[in-house]
Amino acid sequence: MKKITLIAGLLACFFSIGALQAQEKKTNQLQMRKLNLAQFAIANLYVDETDEEKLVESAIIGMLEELDPHSTYSNAEEVKKMNEPLQGNFDGIGIQFNMAEDTLFVIQPVSGGPSEKVGIRAGDRIVMVNDTTIAGVKMSTEDITRRLKGPKGTKVNVKVVRRGVDELLSFTIERDKIPMYSLDASYMMTSKIGYIKINRFGATTHEEFMEALARLKGQGMQDLILALQGNGGGYLNAAIDIANEFLGGGELIVYTEGRRNPRREFFAKGDGKHQSGSLVVLVDEYSASASEIVAGAVQDWDRGMVVGRRTFGKGLVQRPIDLPDGSMIRLTVARYYTPAGRCIQKPYESIEQ
């Protein structure tokens, strides 16, 4: 009798779950019909011509604004700009610059880059790009950057004002791949203490870190200071690879979990190159996401000291969803947790403020 009752209970549970799923599907379909009908009505009945692309983008943005602050929409151009720092390179002329008094000042040309090769120097002021004046005309930094960047192999003509030279200098620069490095610095502070500063967690970060680590160990480094101040994060895998260098085999680095994403755990492999020796991780209020994964793993396993200010508090995992026109939604699909089970995500209200 008990067996029959148990089976009956399981069947009732099964059918209840099925009914709930069917109801959820029906509700979703109803909402989609509602949205499609609204779009159809505006496109076909509104009194004036409408910009369909703008309306759709506004609808997407409106939906995401009802979620968390990190679920965002980016158009195709914004996606390209967003990915460049993490991919490790972009096509351009290879200069670092500042805008001052409505003029582009070259801070320094990238070593070995196309601008340095043709003779552009630190302190030069670029005033014209392809016969278009960019100085003193209130042109936005974005517009100037767009004019200077371009596919590898294409050329751009610039005119430069240089201190001590009376006439304008003309240069033709052939654009090339410009590397963007993840490491700002790596050097020996004492005969035994090394220092490495990582500014982002990108596609080349682990490779750059390993090269720096090997070089410093070759100079006698025993202890390491890892600086993550101002590092706003980047790729999850890059953070896991860096943390792996400090932890013992089988030690949990981080795990992620969400409503539709079951718990996923990431462990150290045991092949790290700095598992012994002291470790200090420097952080500040701008250290976020991937930086907090590394710092959290080091702290929870008591592998080293975490020194600095309270970190930013971004404990969410975004999934990039590519759209047909090259635009993208970054949708929060899970939270990440440190080995001790801490979710360091701060309240959304404090982010918006």
Show the residue positions of the predicted features.
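Bacterial Sec-dependent N-terminal signal peptides
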Residues: 1-28
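Cleft-lining beta-strand/loop regions that shape enzyme active-site pockets
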Residues: 21-31, 35-52, 75, 105-108, ...
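An acidic helix/loop motif centered on a single conserved Asp/Glu
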Residues: 50-68
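Short acidic, Pro/Gly- and aromatic-enriched capping/linker segments at domain boundaries
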Residues: 323-334
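PDZ/PDZ-like peptide-tail recognition elements
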Residues: 58, 70-108
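Conserved functional hotspot residues or short segments at active or partner-binding sites
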Residues: 339-353
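Structural motif
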Residues: 123-125
